[in-house]
């Protein structure tokens, strides 16, 4: 399936990583690519090996016209809910760009509240290079944060499962309780904290 780009001079792609995990921030990225400096091999970050993702992460940061990361921490996720916290994080990523785009393409079926034109693109991380680039920046950023969190809390296995509710993570949550970085509004964490 071919994506037909809207008519615009400066297009930013936006994607998020980390809506499903029980721990840590939801991380978003916004990227404006440089047509004069193409990047080969951009695709949905989930379809790339970690090695390839890391290489592309460096290349995107080097070659893009501009890029920015936006985030929402667990406290904000618990206060707003994951959907609205994700929208806020996307707004922060776009606001953080050093060049203002005239069009923003967002992965998924909903756009955040932006001061410029925007369009949601289902499967955008596979169809739109700018969104693929954003998905890679967001994923590598979040994965590295989970590796850091793993050093603080080595028993939970964060470096491996990245905070997603795997059987191992659920087992540790039940036996060790929640860390301060867990999302207290998420049902499995609520259960572990006896908040249900």
UniProtKB/Swiss-Prot annotation:
EC number(s) reported in the record: 3.1.26.4
| Alphabetized GO MF terms | manganese ion binding; RNA binding; RNA-DNA hybrid ribonuclease activity
- A Pfam match is RNase_HII
Tell whether Hydrolase is among the UniProt keywords. yes
User: What reactions does this protein catalyze?
Assistant: Endonucleolytic cleavage to 5'-phosphomonoester
Q: Which Gene3D superfamilies match?
A: Ribonuclease H-like superfamily/Ribonuclease H
Residues the entry annotates as binding a divalent metal cation: 15-16, 107
Record-annotated RNase H type-2 domain positions: 9-196
Cofactor note text: Manganese or magnesium. Binds 1 divalent metal ion per monomer in the absence of substrate. May bind a second metal ion after substrate binding.
GO terms under cellular component:
cytoplasm; ribonuclease H2 complex
Name the family the entry cites.
Answer: Belongs to the RNase HII family.
Physiological role: Endonuclease that specifically degrades the RNA of RNA-DNA hybrids.
The identity of this protein, by name, is Ribonuclease HII
Taxonomic lineage per UniProt?
Bacteria, Pseudomonadati, Pseudomonadota, Gammaproteobacteria, Enterobacterales
Q: What gene does this protein come from?
A: rnhB
């Amino acid at each position: 399936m071919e994506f037909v780009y809207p008519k615009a001079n400066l297009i930013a792609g936006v994607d998020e990583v980390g809506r499903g995990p029980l721990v840590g921030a939801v991380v978003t990225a916004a990227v404006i690519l440089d047509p004069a400096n193409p990047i080969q091999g951009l695709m949905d970050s989930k379809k790339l090996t970690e090695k390839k993702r890391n290489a592309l992460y460096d290349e995107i940061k080097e070659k893009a016209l501009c890029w920015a990361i936006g985030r929402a921490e667990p406290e904000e996720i618990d206060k707003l809910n994951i959907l609205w916290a994700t929208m806020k994080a996307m707004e922060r990523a776009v606001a953080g760009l050093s060049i203002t785009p005239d069009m923003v393409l967002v992965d998924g079926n909903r756009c955040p509240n932006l001061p410029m034109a925007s369009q949601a693109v289902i499967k955008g991380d596979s169809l739109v290079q700018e969104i693929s680039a954003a998905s890679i920046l967001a994923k590598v950023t979040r994965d590295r944060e989970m590796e850091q969190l793993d050093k603080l809390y080595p028993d939970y296995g964060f470096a491996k499962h990245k905070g997603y509710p795997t059987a191992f993570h659920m087992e540790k949550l039940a036996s060790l309780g929640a860390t301060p970085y867990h999302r207290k509004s998420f049902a499995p964490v609520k259960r572990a904290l006896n908040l249900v």
